[in-house]
């Protein structure tokens, strides 16, 4: 007999809990001892979008086999099933004390005849984590005193019900909102308010007019979405880390640049003036220690330079660049981070204008490098490095003007043509350029191999 079959039942069930329920059921053919193990597996994870009747019969058999045994996690990912039977499945696991419930019930049309969530889902004193996808409506009373994590994806909501829901979750620590649609077809003023929330992830909320945050102990924010008309309130005093990725269309970028250059047509002013309100969002996160900005976000911030807050606690700043997005806001960002220690640049190539600022060497200026000389950054990381002459010149510019720089780390972009060259040649060229910067340690990672230049 093999060693695996000799393991205790408890350990075998723990191993099976890492498989989907269908995969776990298939192990019953291994031996008689394995035949009924599925009845004792504490996690049920069911995914099926094919033969609907057979699928529903399978779920019925699994739950019947498990009887009243305790259950920790129930995940259901399916489409086109009988809503009454789904309600029975949910009721079954809730009676058995499920603490994590994930439901993704998809129908053929978007939010047409979607599965209406079993109302008792929101009356459970043991539920700790709840994930809902493709659910069209949340209704009924709410009693989830232990819920810590709520994940909403492709869900159709009422703003009023959503705000009531948040206030009814006293233990909520993590909220994830992906592709949220609102039942209100007119102007939507959304307030994310929670006294207990620590982690918030927002990806693409549709048709929102204003967005406010009242989250006094929030520690982590990941926000990706189109710029709303106004960020009316942003109470995030205890925020530690933020990732901001604003979405814009190409026409908006053209209008932003025209406004900066005083070339914007009067009819287009309204379309971009809302971008100036992004400063309110930035002001709300001013106490952070770690900040990540996308290329679009950096470009939009060019309209907020005069109102940019001082990030007095910021230690690590990560900025992703794109060749078609500008660095106009880079100088003010560096000047407004008086205690910055680590700067991470994901790419160096960017859209060059005469207002690109003094942070790079793209345009000859009298105040070249001024924003760098006042920046206390000690570690500079360059990711996606391609080994071009333009990049190497820019890095040399950083080495010359960052007065406190102690360490430079460069990561060659994977699968980049530059890697086809002899690494020693690339390294030799770079070290020759940077040999005068003797006060800084330089590291270059090429194809998994690390090259170093250490100071004495």
UniProtKB/Swiss-Prot annotation:
Disulfide bonds: none
Superkingdom of origin organism: Eukaryota
Stretches assigned to the F-box domain: 1-54
PROSITE patterns according to UniProt: FBOX
PANTHER family the UniProt entry points to: F-BOX_RNI SUPERFAMILY PROTEIN, RNI-LIKE SUPERFAMILY PROTEIN
Name of the protein: Putative F-box protein At5g38390
Organism the protein comes from: Arabidopsis thaliana (Mouse-ear cress)
């Amino acid at each position: 007999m093999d060693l695996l079959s000799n393991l205790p039942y408890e350990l075998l069930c723990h191993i099976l809990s890492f498989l989907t329920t269908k995969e776990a059921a298939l192990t019953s053919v291994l031996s008689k001892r394995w035949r009924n193990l599925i009845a004792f597996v504490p996690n049920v994870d069911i995914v099926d979008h094919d033969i609907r009747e057979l699928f529903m019969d399978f779920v019925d058999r699994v739950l019947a086999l498990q009887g009243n045994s305790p259950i920790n996690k129930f995940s259901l990912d399916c489409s086109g099933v009988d809503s009454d039977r789904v309600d029975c499945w949910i009721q079954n696991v809730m009676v058995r004390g499920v603490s994590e419930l994930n439901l993704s019930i998809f129908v053929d049309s978007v939010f047409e005849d979607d599965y209406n969530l079993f109302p008792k889902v929101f009356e459970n004193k043991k539920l700790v984590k709840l994930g809902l996808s493709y659910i069209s409506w949340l209704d009924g009373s709410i009693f989830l005193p232990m819920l810590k994590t709520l994940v909403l994806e492709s869900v159709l909501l009422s703003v009023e019900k959503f705000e009531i829901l948040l206030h009814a979750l006293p233990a909520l620590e993590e909220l994830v909102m992906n592709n949220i649609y609102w039942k209100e077809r007119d102007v939507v003023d959304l307030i994310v308010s929670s006294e207990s929330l620590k982690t918030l992830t927002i990806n693409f909320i549709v048709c929102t007019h204003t967005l406010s945050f009242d989250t006094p102990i929030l520690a982590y924010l990941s926000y990706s979405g189109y710029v709303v008309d106004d960020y009316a309130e942003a109470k995030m005093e205890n925020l530690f880390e933020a990732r901001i990725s604003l979405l814009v269309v190409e026409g908006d970028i053209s209008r932003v640049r025209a406004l900066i250059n005083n070339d914007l047509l009067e009819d287009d002013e309204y379309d971009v003036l809302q971008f100036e309100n992004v400063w309110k969002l930035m002001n709300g996160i001013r106490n952070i220690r770690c900040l990540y900005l996308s290329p679009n976000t950096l470009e939009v911030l060019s309209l907020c330079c005069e109102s940019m807050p001082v990030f007095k606690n910021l230690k690590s700043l990560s900025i992703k660049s794109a060749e078609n997005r500008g660095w106009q806001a880079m100088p003010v960002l560096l000047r407004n981070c008086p205690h910055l220690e680590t700067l991470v640049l994901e790419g160096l190539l960017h859209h060059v204008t005469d207002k690109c600022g003094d942070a790079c060497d793209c345009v000859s200026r009298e105040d070249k490098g001024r924003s760098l000389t006042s920046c206390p950054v000690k570690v500079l990381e360059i990711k996606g490095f391609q080994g071009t002459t333009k990049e190497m010149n820019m890095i040399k510019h950083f080495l010359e003007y960052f007065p406190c720089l102690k360490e430079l780390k460069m990561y060659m972009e994977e699968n980049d043509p530059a890697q086809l060259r002899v690494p020693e040649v690339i390294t030799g060229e770079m070290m020759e350029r940077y040999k005068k910067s003797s006060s800084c340690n330089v590291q270059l990672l090429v194809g998994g191999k690390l090259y170093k230049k250490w100071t004495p």
